[in-house]
Structure formats: structure tokens, C-alpha cells
């Protein structure tokens, strides 16, 4: 679960567009959406549902924000997928009672980034309990890189931390190569109780949140999808329509690009993904597709592996 700014304006592009006021009094309006994406270790970042930030017509009401949009999106997600097992990954903005309560009410698990300064009482409890749980501090050497040397990993976890009416579990992860500094550092809170058998896996799942930003938003902004382009400067309906079509296109491309045999083809033929798509588009533009042959292909049983 994460949000992103799509484009900014020096004028109000549509009614209800959120805005910020700078120190010198200048207003900047920004189209902003929050996304529920399905992410995986293989790089998938597939949009499941979107929600836009839009201010109320009531001028006295506070502006819409990402946390308010999350509550609306969570309600819709539960309504559409009432029995779907869900593990929500979210950044440090979501480490609050509203998020924890929503997950508990919907019977969802969560792993949320835990930043310094967030939930100070929880950090204080962690500081007190750290020395008391030496058996919950784990180390391992995972692999050797020919340039950077051995990769060392260290993890520590603590269960049953009290925050308001919630029981939280904390995990901290550090990783470094012997010839590279500084080390990687991640800290997460989760409702899933940990032990030596699952602590590494919980931390790894928490770090997959980066797929939303990297394989998701960053690819759509800088990978040819033109997410931030102002195709419509005044019509929010047109902007939303393009956004939804973009998510569908990105989904189709991911399902094609991440096939194992496509990856092997790119590796063996030393062809870039961009070049492969350009060749395919050129082929479709210049060749007539035979309906009989197409139907024959559609009727064949295929198993896709990722």
C-alpha cells in the first residue's frame, strides 16, 4: 500500500484537487493517488485497486490526505475481496492506530516500516528489551560477491510490544558486504509473531514494499508509461481513465516480461527488453494475423511459469 504524486500545477486543475502552500504563500496543486498493489519477490507490482485524493466541497473541512484515502481504499478492498488473505506492506506513514485498527477489523496481517521517531513509547520499550533477548539476535553469511566480498546479515526481533490496545512485534535487519559501507538497515513492525523459523522471512517480506515504488511507480513514471504526463490539464475524469488504462497495460506487460522463457531468451540472445518490444510492435504493424492460426493458438493449453 502506497501513494504517489502524479503531476503538479500552479493553478487548480479540477475542483477538489489537493494543494500545498509554501512558506512564501504560493499554492501548488497536486494530483495524488494511493494504490493497493500485489507485489512479489520476482518483481511483480500489480495494481489491484486505486483511490484518488480529493478535497470535500465543505471549505471548512480539512484537506484529504493519504491516511484518509487508505481508509476508503481498505473498505473497498475488503468489499471486493472479502475472503482474500491479505498481508499489507506499508511505509512509516502508516505506523499508527488507524492503520493497525483497520487491519485488525478486516482480519489482515501487516508489516509496516518503523522509522526513528515514530511511536516513541514503542522505541523506548525496544531499547529496554534488546539486552534481555540475546537469543533473538541472529547472524548469517549468505553469499560471496566477486567484487564486494561476502554478504553478512544480522537480524533481531522482539515480540509482544505494547502500543495502545495492540500487540506489536518488531524486527530489525542489517546487511553489509565486507568491502562496502555503509550497511543496509531496515526496521519493521508486524502483527505476526516471530521465532527463529520465520523471522528472516518476515523481514524479507517487509522489504518487498520497495517493489511498489521501484517496479511500480518508478517504472510507470520513467519506463515509457508517462504516468506524470499531463494528458488532460483540466478534466480529472480523463486523467483517471488514462491512469486506469496505464495500470492494465503495465499488468499485461509484467505478465509477459516476467515469464521464465522470456527471461531466458533475453539472457541468451543478449537483447534488451525495449528492443524486444520494438521488434514485436514492428511485427504486428507489418504482418496480417491469420484468424484461423490465431484461434488455433488460443485453443491450445498453455502453462505460464514465473
Name every feature range the model reports, one short phrase each.
Residues 1-6, 36, 70, 88-93, ...:
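Short, conserved catalytic/metal-binding motifs centered on acidic residues
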Residues 56-172:
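An internal, acidic/charged active-site-proximal segment
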